[in-house]
Amino acid sequence: GYKITIDTDKCTGDGECVDVCPVEVYELQDGKAVAVNEDECLGCESCVEVCEQDALTVEEN
């Protein structure tokens, strides 16, 4: 599995991670990304690549 860390101070809620994730891990809540389906994460790191704020980290656990 994978552990997703979201730096809410950096996150601007642009939703890029929501759009790019192939397994719908993220949704926006109160203008911030939340990893609601972390168990589905494939570890592809597409979200990390598209996040202009560098707010996401994905680590294998």
UniProtKB/Swiss-Prot annotation:
[3Fe-4S] cluster binds at residues 11, 17, 51. The keyword Transferase does not apply. [4Fe-4S] cluster binds at residues 21, 41, 44, 47. Pfam families: Fer4_10 (PF13237). Transmembrane segments: none annotated. Keywords: 3Fe-4S, 4Fe-4S, Electron transport, Iron, Iron-sulfur, Metal-binding, Repeat, Transport. Binds 1 [3Fe-4S] cluster. Binds 1 [4Fe-4S] cluster. InterPro entries: 4Fe4S_Fe-S-bd, 4Fe4S_Fe_S_CS, Fe-S_Ferredoxin. Its cofactor is [3Fe-4S] cluster; [4Fe-4S] cluster. PROSITE patterns: 4FE4S_FER_1, 4FE4S_FER_2. Residues 2-31, 32-61 form the 4Fe-4S ferredoxin-type domain. The keyword Transferase does not apply. GO terms for molecular function: 3 iron, 4 sulfur cluster binding; 4 iron, 4 sulfur cluster binding; metal ion binding. Ferredoxins are iron-sulfur proteins that transfer electrons in a wide variety of metabolic reactions. This is Ferredoxin-3. It comes from Desulfocurvibacter africanus. The lineage of its organism: Bacteria, Pseudomonadati, Thermodesulfobacteriota, Desulfovibrionia, Desulfovibrionales.
